[in-house]
């Protein structure tokens, strides 16, 4: 703009239509190495993890269900949430223990014990 007032000659309008979007190739042309040694290492690591999990987790009983238990920390009183897989009868035993003399502490209180 030249001068104190705008004129039509000062305003440049680009009235051409916007260009249409162009297709983009999203394919990845990366070549993976065919190393059976890498696969053996992955399989060996996977098998070790499966064996560890098999020892860490007992078999879930066929009549077992998942239950959420909310209790308070014995030391600080913060609410604790437990999830157990158990049969209905075993859950009743756990309930009796929690209502009786069995107390649970939170991880922060457990580290101070």
Curated annotation (Swiss-Prot):
Motif annotated as LXCXE motif, chain positions: 26-30
Keywords: Activator, DNA-binding, Early protein, G1/S host cell cycle checkpoint dysregulation by virus, Host cytoplasm, Host nucleus, Host-virus interaction, Inhibition of host innate immune response by virus, Inhibition of host interferon signaling pathway by virus, Interferon antiviral system evasion, Metal-binding, Modulation of host cell cycle by virus, Oncogene, Transcription, Transcription regulation, Viral immunoevasion, Zinc, Zinc-finger
A molecular function GO annotation: DNA binding
unnamed zinc finger span: 73-109
E7 terminal domain: annotated segments: 1-47
Location relative to the cell: Host cytoplasm; Host nucleus
Region spans: Disordered: 30-62
Written domain comment of the UniProt record: The E7 terminal domain is an intrinsically disordered domain, whose flexibility and conformational transitions confer target adaptability to the oncoprotein. It allows adaptation to a variety of protein targets and exposes the PEST degradation sequence that regulates its turnover in the cell.
Summary of the function given for this chain in its UniProt record: Plays a role in viral genome replication by driving entry of quiescent cells into the cell cycle. Stimulation of progression from G1 to S phase allows the virus to efficiently use the cellular DNA replicating machinery to achieve viral genome replication. E7 protein has both transforming and trans-activating activities. Induces the disassembly of the E2F1 transcription factor from RB1, with subsequent transcriptional activation of E2F1-regulated S-phase genes. Interferes with host histone deacetylation mediated by HDAC1 and HDAC2, leading to transcription activation.
Family membership noted in the UniProt record: Belongs to the papillomaviridae E7 protein family.
Protein name: Protein E7
